[in-house]
C-alpha cells in the first residue's frame, strides 16, 4: 500500500507498514484503509482491490472494459470508499448502468491533481443511465466533464453548484439528457409528492435528485460546504461533506483541511507536517519515505523532503535539500548542486551509489566508475549522473564491463585535475571490455585543465576514438609513449572497417526487406554473421551508441543474422546477398538502420570488419485512425452539415473521407405511451443550431443573405482559445486510449450512387397496431432506411435531400489512398436530426363533427400526413358562447381508436372548437374554428314550446317580484319571527328549509321515545343549544344501555332554527362510517327536540390537542402525540372525508374544532355545526355575509365562493398543521383581512417548528394553488396505509366493499345545482376509455378533478395546472 501519487505503482511494498500505522489511527472517520491511486482496465479483477479502501490517495481510473455486462456489476459494491484525493475517471466501461451501488458512500473528490482541469470525468460510457453518486457532496477543486454518454440521464436534476464552488468550467455535453429525451422523475413525483429539495438554477425551480429513488442532499445555505446531518443540522466548520453529529470535528465524514488522530483540524500543529493536502504526518513518517525510496532501486518514487511545513516529493525550483534535516534551502542565484566527496573520491559501482549523486552539477572530488552489471544501466546512469558539468579531481573508468559508451555524462564539459590519479592522470580508462565509444565528438566538448590520459586494455575501443579525445580535450602532447597502449586498445574491434552498402530495400506498412552487399574477410571462417540495428528516428540525427550498455539496455533493436552460404564452386562469381525482413514496424514511420559484421578475434593477425552508414527508411502508409471531433448540425429541414478534424494518426497522406448516413426510426416507446397521463413528461427532440462560422454562412448564404451581410462572428478571447486548446488536449489523450484496443476496419462496401440520396423523401412513421383501427398512417418501408454513401475530399459535407425532423446516424471514415483497395479507418459515429418543417404538424382539412343524443358530440379530423417526427397528442380547445375556453388532451392511442374525440355532458348552447397537433418538434397551428349547436335533449317541438314558454316566463317574473319583497322585509326585520339567520357550515346538508321555511320534519324509524333518554351532565354549548352526556336505553341493538351525547335546541329558538336542527340530523342518517360521528336517534315529539349522537369522550380535537401541551392546566398526564399517533389521526380524518366525498358531500368547514375524539382516541368527523358558538373567533364575516372560517379556506373558496372536495383538501392541510402545532391559531399575528389577501395571493402556512418532514410534505401537497393538483382523501390514506394500526383495515371506509366504485358513477343534477360541484373542465373524451357511460346528459363528478391531469406543457398557468412558486407565510 503506497502513499502519494509518485509511489502509487512503484513503492507499494515499501509503505505497507506506514499505511497500517495510519489505518490504526484513523478512528471512525475513515473505517477502512488508505489505498494508492489505481488504474483499473480491461477487466474487473483489480476492482476488488477497492474492497477495504476508505480513501484513495491518488486518482481512480476505470476504463476500457468491453466484455463486461450489467450482471457483472450487480454484486459489486464498495461502501467503505468515502474520498478520492485526486480525480475519478470512467471511460468505455460496458455494462455499467449506475454508480449508486458501486460507490454508494463516495462523498468527497478533492481534486488535488486533476485530469485536464477536471476532477470528475465520465466519457463514452455507452450503457451508463445515471450517475447515482447520491452521497457526493463536495468536489473541492476542479470541474466536471461528462461527455458522449448516449444513455445518461438525470443530469439536469443535479444542482452542481451545491457540490462545486464554481460550475462555469463544467463541460456536460452530448449526453442523452441534452436531447431532452430523458423522463427524469425524482422520488415521489409520479405519485404527486414532492420528496426532494428544489433549488433555482437559471431561473428554474426544479427538484434535485440523482436517480428515481435517491434525492440530492441539499444542506441549508448557512452550512456552506461543511455539510449537515441527516436532520439538516450544520456540521463543524472543519467538516466536509456530511457528519453524524453537528458541530463536532470528530464526527465528520471527511475533513475540510487536514485529518489528525481521529479529528479534523484547520492546520497541522507542530511537530506535524501537511501531507498530500489532506492529512498530518510527523517527521519520522516523511523521513521513512525519503530513505526507503532512496534505498530502493525502483524508479518513480520520491525522496520526500520538508518545506514550508509540508512533506513534499522534492524541493521546489530555486531550493536545494539539506541532507542533515531534509529541509529545502534557497539557492543564491542559479541553483547549482555542489556535491562534496568527503573522502576525496567516490566509487560508483551500482545504480544505488549513482542515485546518491542525483541532481549534482559540480563534484568536489574525484569519481571512479566501476560498474560490472545492472538493469537499464544507460538510462539509470544518465538520470543520476547526467547533470554533472564539472569534476574538480579526476575521472577513472575501471573494469566497467557494462559500459559501452560514456555518453551518460551528457553535460560533463570540464575536468580540472586538481587531484590526479597516481602517475598524474586526470582521465583513466583501464580494462573496460565493452567500451566502444567515449562521446560523440561531433556534439560534445570536453576540457581537461591539467593531467594526462591513460588507456589500457580496452579491447573494443579503437585508437581513433582515443586520438579524437586528445584533440578535443586539449591534452594532445601531454601523454607519454606508454600512457596509451597500441596493442590492448581496439585489438578486438573492427577498427579498420570496410563500408557495407545496401543493395535492395523494399517496404510495406509494417515491414522492411533489406539486402546488402556480401562481405568476406581474408579467412571467410572469421565471419560469424551480421548484426542489424534499427530504431524509430523522427529526425535524421541518430548516432550508433545512443542509450547502449553492455548489459542489454539498448535503444536500438538488434537482430543477429547468420552469414550466407558460401558456394563451394571456385568459379562462382555471384555470391548471394545477405538480408533480413524487419517485421512488426509502425506504419508511416521513419527508421534509422545500420548493419555491421561480427568477426572472430585472432592474436596472430589483424582484425577486419565492415559496417554500413546509418540509413533512414520510412514504412508505407496503412489505415488511419478515426477522424477527430465529428460535429453534425442541421441548417434546414432537409440538410445536415457535417464537420470533423483529421485523424491523430493519419498513417499516410489523407486523400479523402467516406461518409455514410442512415435514417433512424423513432423509439417504439413513443407509439405506446399516453402522454396525457399524470407523471409522463412530454417527449421532445431537438436539433443543433447551425455553426456560427464562415463555412456555415456559406452553406446558408442563399437562405440568410440579409443577415449574413450585416453580422460577423466576434474574435475569440484568450480564455476561449485556451479552453479550446485544453479540450483538444483532452480529446487527444483519449485517442491514445483508443489505440490500446484493436479495431477491425469496416468491410468494404459496394459504392452507391450519390443520386440515390434524392430518394430519401419525407414519409410518415410506423404506427403500432391498435385493435379495430383503420389508420391512414403509411408504414415506413425498409428501403427508406437504407444507408447512403458519399466520398469527400475536404473536412466538411452538406448532406441534402433528407426528411424533415428526422434522426440520422452518420458514420465517417478517413482514407489515405484513392484506389480499389482503400485504406480507411474505423468509423467515427455521430447523430443528427434535421430541423422541423414549418407547416408539417398542421392538421389537414377542417374539423368535422357529429352530434348524437344525450349531448354527445363526436369531433373528427385528419392526422398530419408528414409530421415532424410523429404526433404524440392532440389538444382540443372548445368553448360555449359566453363561457371560458376549455382545453382537452387527446392521446395518440385515443385518437387512433376514435379517429377524433367525443365530448360528453355538454350544456345546451353554441360552441366553437379548434384542434392542434403536438409532435416531437412542438405544437402545430390551430385549425380554423368549427361551430355547432347543442340543444337540450328534453326539448319538445317548437309549437308545444311556445305554449309552455309563455306561462313559464310569467311564473318566473312573479317569483322574482315575490322574492324581492321577501328579501326587503327580511332586511327591515332581521330578528323577526324567523329569528336571526346563522350561516350553516354545510349548506349541502340542509333540506329545502331555506326555500320552503314552512316544511315540517316527519318522524321515521330513527324516532326514539323520550322516556328512554336520561340526561346526566352538560358537555358544552352547541350552535343550536346545550349538548349533554346521557344514557339511552335499547338504542343500539344488543346493548341495554348506551352512553350517548344529546344535542338540544334552545327554548327561544325560532321555527327555522328548529327545522334546520332536525334537517341537519336527517342528513346524518345516511352516514355509516366508523370515522364519521354516528347519529343514533331523534326525539322530535314534544319539547325540547333532542338529537342523540355517538358519545365522543374526549371532546373536539382542538381542545384535546391543546390539553396535551406540556404547560396546559388541564393536561390529563399524557405526553404530546408521537409521529405515529399524528399519522394515525391524519389517516382517520382522511378516511372520514373520503367517505363524505364518496357520498357527494362537501364539508366546507373542516377544522380541528369540527373533529371529535372518541374514548379510544379515534378521531372522527364531527357533527357539522356543534362548535360554531364555542369557537366563534375562528370565523369572520366578510362583507356583511355569513360567518366564514377564512383561516381554513382555500384560495378559490375565498375568491369565488367555490367549494369542492379539493377545497376540503386545503382545509385538511390546515388540520394537519393544527395537529403538529398542538392546535395553535393558523396565521397567528395576521388579521382576518390580511389572511384573506395573503391566501388569495398564493401564500400558505410555514410548517411548525420541528415538524416531521413527512407531514410537511403532506401539507404542501394539500396547499397546491391549483385545486386539480391537490391529492384526494383516498390518495392520502393510500400513502399512509403501511404505517397505521392493524385494526384500521377492519373499520375504515378505504378498505371497505363500499369503496369499490361501480362501472360508472354519475349523478343527475339540475343546472342550478352546479355552483357547488367541482366540474370537470376536461369533458369526458378520455373518461370514455375508463368505462364511463355513453348515454345520458348527466354530469359526472367522480373525481374528475383528480383523474384528469392538466397538461402543463401548454402555456402553463393557474388555469391549466402549472405548479407555481408560492410566497411563504411568516406569521411571526
Curated annotation (Swiss-Prot):
Positions of region (Insulin-binding): 735-743
Main location: membrane
Disordered as annotated region, ranges: 688-709, 1349-1372
Residue numbers spanned by region Important for interaction with IRS1, SHC1 and STAT5B: 986-989
Activity regulation (UniProt): Activated in response to insulin. Autophosphorylation activates the kinase activity. PTPN1, PTPRE and PTPRF dephosphorylate important tyrosine residues, thereby reducing INSR activity. Inhibited by ENPP1. GRB10 and GRB14 inhibit the catalytic activity of the INSR, they block access of substrates to the activated receptor. SOCS1 and SOCS3 act as negative regulators of INSR activity, they bind to the activated INRS and interfere with the phosphorylation of INSR substrates. Interacts with PTPRF.
Parts of the chain on the Extracellular side: 28-748, 753-946
Stretches assigned to the Fibronectin type-III domain: 626-728, 744-838, 843-937
Record: glycosylation sites: 43, 52, 105, 138, 242, 282, 322, 364, 424, 445, 541, 635, 653, 700, 759, 772, 910, 923
PROSITE patterns cross-referenced by the UniProt entry: FN3, PROTEIN_KINASE_ATP, PROTEIN_KINASE_DOM, PROTEIN_KINASE_TYR, RECEPTOR_TYR_KIN_II
Signal sequence, renumbered to the chain: 1-27
Catalytic residue list: 1149
GO molecular function: amyloid-beta binding; ATP binding; GTP binding; insulin binding; insulin receptor activity; insulin receptor substrate binding; insulin-like growth factor I binding; insulin-like growth factor II binding
A biological process term (GO) from this entry: positive regulation of DNA-templated transcription
Keyword vocabulary terms for this entry: ATP-binding, Carbohydrate metabolism, Cell membrane, Cleavage on pair of basic residues, Disulfide bond, Endosome, Glycoprotein, Isopeptide bond, Kinase, Lysosome, Membrane, Nucleotide-binding, Phosphoprotein, Receptor, Repeat, S-nitrosylation, Signal, Transferase, Transmembrane, Transmembrane helix, Tyrosine-protein kinase, Ubl conjugation
Record-annotated site: Insulin-binding: 66
Positions of region (PIK3R1 binding): 1351-1354
Cytoplasmic side: 968-1372
Post-translational modification: After being transported from the endoplasmic reticulum to the Golgi apparatus, the single glycosylated precursor is further glycosylated and then cleaved, followed by its transport to the plasma membrane. Autophosphorylated on tyrosine residues in response to insulin. Phosphorylation of Tyr-989 is required for IRS1-, SHC1-, and STAT5B-binding. Dephosphorylated by PTPRE on Tyr-989, Tyr-1175, Tyr-1179 and Tyr-1180 residues. May also be phosphorylated at Tyr-1175 and Tyr-1180 by mTORC2. Dephosphorylated by PTPRF and PTPN1. Dephosphorylated by PTPN2 and Ptprv; down-regulates insulin-induced signaling.
Catalytic activity reported: L-tyrosyl-[protein] + ATP = O-phospho-L-tyrosyl-[protein] + ADP + H(+)
Membrane-spanning parts: 947-967
Residues where ATP binds: 1023, 1047, 1094-1100, 1153-1154, 1167
Family: Belongs to the protein kinase superfamily. Tyr protein kinase family. Insulin receptor subfamily.
Protein's UniProt name: Insulin receptor
Species: Mus musculus
